[in-house]
Amino acid sequence: MENRKNYFHLHLISDSTGETLIAAGRAAAAQFQSSHALEHVYPLIRNRKQLMQVMDAVDGAPGIVLYTIVDRELAGLIDQRCREIGVPCVSVLDPIIELFQSYLGSPSRRRSGAQHVMDAEYFARIEALNFTMDHDDGQVPSDFNEADVVLVGVSRTSKTPTSIYLANRGIKTANIPIVPGVPLPDALLKATKPLIVGLIASAERLSQVRQHRVLGTTQSFHGEDYTDRAAIAEELKYARSLCARNNWPLIDVTRRSIEETAAAIVALRPRLR
């Protein structure tokens, strides 16, 4: 017999990509660390036949059902089948949409994937992603002034994943490594437009991450001091000094997720929101 205290099935049914549901489901599941959610994601469910196949899967692995289905008939079928199976279900967006309708005094469009319209904002994200990929790890330093954000930091401070996350929000982001003894490009030091932010982490954390990175490679490829905590501490001291000298804010990413780091960066300049 399945032990719900250890794990549970989480069924995510969407008529679009399922991204909204996945984010909501994971945010809720993260509050229950003693139980592991086994995710079952069903995107692009838009007709009765597809839905019935999904509900058969739910019947075979009972658990929590979350859904975002704008078609009222299909949503009603989910509620009905969940009652028959004996599992709880929640329409994630309905309470929010109803609140909006009540406050704004107008009905919603009830359109699948309405947040994924290929509008100006969509193309701005594509442009930001292209810019960010072209300016990863110090590439094309001559046009740093075209960036919204430039991240600087020693190796393994999550510069690249944070840059990509910001780019997905339409924020053009470049990043460049800080290496003691290697001067930063003049174009960066003279840039006036971008928000320049330094990323740091504890020497212990960086040593652990770097040790994982060198697995399968030779230590000499990275340098003998790459994972040495004392050497890393000196790198961090240099990075802090460099950022202080240029009045660049510092963010410690030791205990931050990529999302939390990105939120802290955006908070430094509200116009990025």
UniProtKB/Swiss-Prot annotation:
<keyword id="KW-0723">Serine/threonine-protein kinase</keyword>
<keyword id="KW-0808">Transferase</keyword>
<dbReference type="GO" id="GO:0043531">
    <property type="term" value="F:ADP binding"/>
</dbReference>
<dbReference type="GO" id="GO:0004674">
    <property type="term" value="F:protein serine/threonine kinase activity"/>
</dbReference>
<comment type="similarity">
    <text>Belongs to the pyruvate, phosphate/water dikinase regulatory protein family. PDRP subfamily.</text>
</comment>
<keyword id="KW-0418">Kinase</keyword>
<dbReference type="InterPro" id="IPR005177">
    <property type="entry name" value="Kinase-pyrophosphorylase"/>
</dbReference>
<protein>
    <recommendedName>
        <fullName>Putative pyruvate, phosphate dikinase regulatory protein</fullName>
        <ecNumber>2.7.11.32</ecNumber>
        <ecNumber>2.7.4.27</ecNumber>
    </recommendedName>
</protein>
<feature type="binding site">
    <location>
        <begin position="153"/>
        <end position="160"/>
    </location>
    <ligand>
        <name>ADP</name>
    </ligand>
</feature>
<dbReference type="GO" id="GO:0016776">
    <property type="term" value="F:phosphotransferase activity, phosphate group as acceptor"/>
</dbReference>
<dbReference type="GO" id="GO:0005524">
    <property type="term" value="F:ATP binding"/>
</dbReference>
<comment type="function">
    <text>Bifunctional serine/threonine kinase and phosphorylase involved in the regulation of the pyruvate, phosphate dikinase (PPDK) by catalyzing its phosphorylation/dephosphorylation.</text>
</comment>
<dbReference type="Pfam" id="PF03618">
    <property type="entry name" value="Kinase-PPPase"/>
</dbReference>
<dbReference type="InterPro" id="IPR026565">
    <property type="entry name" value="PPDK_reg"/>
</dbReference>
<keyword id="KW-0547">Nucleotide-binding</keyword>
